[in-house]
Amino acid sequence: RDTDRSRGLGDVYKRQLEKYGIGEVLNLRNRHSDDDEAKGTSIKLHRVKTKAHSISEKQLIQALRIIKNRKAPIVFHCHHGSDRTGAVCAFYRIIFQNVSKEDAIHEMTEGGYGFHRIYKNIIRRIKEANVEQIRKEVMEGGEL
């Protein structure tokens, strides 16, 4: 797998990332960087600061561009690995794997990742997304 999702990083996760050849990490948390956890590794860090209650299309496009332009297998995460990570994963599946919005929403909410139903805004963002426009912006976007 070239992409994967996760909860926040810790020492155990860091060792596992190195063990499985993960070379890049995309952090979706607003408050905490991965600098301390990645210290002493060759893992390349990326960050798009997001909040689950207000994740924007611009932030999603930025995250998807990072994933598209990665040079090594990447894992993306927030704190719980369910809401912000779920949104990025859903859009990844829609944009890169041509999964339907309905299937991506079902996977995000019923896939066992702990989606918090209070974040109806994420479901609405997916339902209302102009997939072709987002795909165009992601694909035309160079490295960030």
Residue spans for each PLM region:
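Cysteine-based protein phosphatase catalytic domain of the PTP/DSP
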Residues: 11-72
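PTP/DSP superfamily signal
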Residues: 53, 64-72, 91-144
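Second-shell loop/turn segments in exported
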Residues: 7, 22, 49-53, 79, ...
